[in-house]
């Protein structure tokens, strides 16, 4: 019996390559302008995702980084602060997007291989003082690559 060895590289969406069947599916997909809500494939994906999560609507994003940055922007105001693990992707690998896109500062917590506790979060929340940034968001990642993938 011959074993078939195939390596699937899941390090990042930037290192994956579509196979011929994927390319064929892309080339034959019915498309439209998403800005005008005319792309049936995107609409179907968003509708299925919204239904899956029991939500009114969903938004398709082209990358995890884009999704992270949109979520931060939606949940914060400029001058506020978010809390995240010191090894988090949003802090190390998203080109200072937190500060650039949202005008938000980061408070880093030293977790245990990417895991931070409720007690650590509670201790990191700024008190309600005019001279301190309001803590408005806690960002948790699953998994934290830089922390060993835990």
Question: Model regions: which residues?
Answer:
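N-terminal amphipathic/basic leader segments beginning at the initiator methionine
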Residues: 1-25
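Solvent-exposed alpha-helices and their adjacent loops that cap or buttress functional pockets
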Residues: 2-3, 50-53, 74-75, 99-101, ...
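Structural motif
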Residues: 8, 57-60, 80-82, 105-107, ...
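Conserved N-terminal alpha-helix of the aminotransferase class I/II PLP-enzyme fold
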Residues: 18-64, 85-91, 97-99
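Conserved core of the PLP fold type I
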Residues: 56-76, 109-111, 142
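Conserved PLP-anchoring active-site segment centered on the Schiff-base-forming lysine
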Residues: 74-92
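PLP-dependent aminotransferase-class I/II
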Residues: 102-150
């Amino acid at each position: 019996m011959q074993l078939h060895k195939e390596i699937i590289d899941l390090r990042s969406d930037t290192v994956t390559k579509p196979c011929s069947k994927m390319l064929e599916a892309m080339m034959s997909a019915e498309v439209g302008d998403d800005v005008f809500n005319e792309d049936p494939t995107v609409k179907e994906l968003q509708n299925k995702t919204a239904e899956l999560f029991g939500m009114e609507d969903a938004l398709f994003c082209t990358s995890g980084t884009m999704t992270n940055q949109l979520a931060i922007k939606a949940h914060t105001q400029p001058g506020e602060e978010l809390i995240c693990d010191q090894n988090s992707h949003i802090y190390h690998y998203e080109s200072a997007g937190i500060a650039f896109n949202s005008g938000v500062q980061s408070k880093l917590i030293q977790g245990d291989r990417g895991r931070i506790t409720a007690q650590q979060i509670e201790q990191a929340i700024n008190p309600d003082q005019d001279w301190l940034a309001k803590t408005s968001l806690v960002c948790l990642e699953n998994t934290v690559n830089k922390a060993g993938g835990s």
